[in-house]
Amino acid sequence: MGGTSAIDALLDAARADLDRVQPRNLATEFAAGALVVDTRPVEQRQRDGELPGAVVIDRNVLEWRIDPSSPHHIPEITDTGRRVIIVCNEGYSSSLAAVSLRRLGLHRATDLVGGYQALRAAQTAALPDGGLRGESL
């Protein structure tokens, strides 16, 4: 078996259209008004730590919570022009999630390169302390 798997090809295609954020730039993006969304499962957040200032949304309800036309959208999203940065554990599912949000019209959606683990490894003070909110549909 050789070559690239179908999921690798899908991921490569997704990332080709994203202007992904480097861990060192996350605080700057946040300060400029980006909404940072942590989609890691609760078990990973409990094990590795929370991302202060991020809104916590389970991946399985992300589109409903971020789509401004959905009756279930979070109050931080009022239109499709807001910069949204998705953070998962290692930066894989977040790329696919960002593309899904772009398909909903959020043309500035993107993700964090390497996810939370890259942020942690860089020992970057990513976001100012802020309250985290768990979100569900």
Which residues does each predicted region cover?
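Rhodanese-like catalytic fold shared by cysteine-dependent sulfurtransferases
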Residues: 1-35, 42-83, 92-137
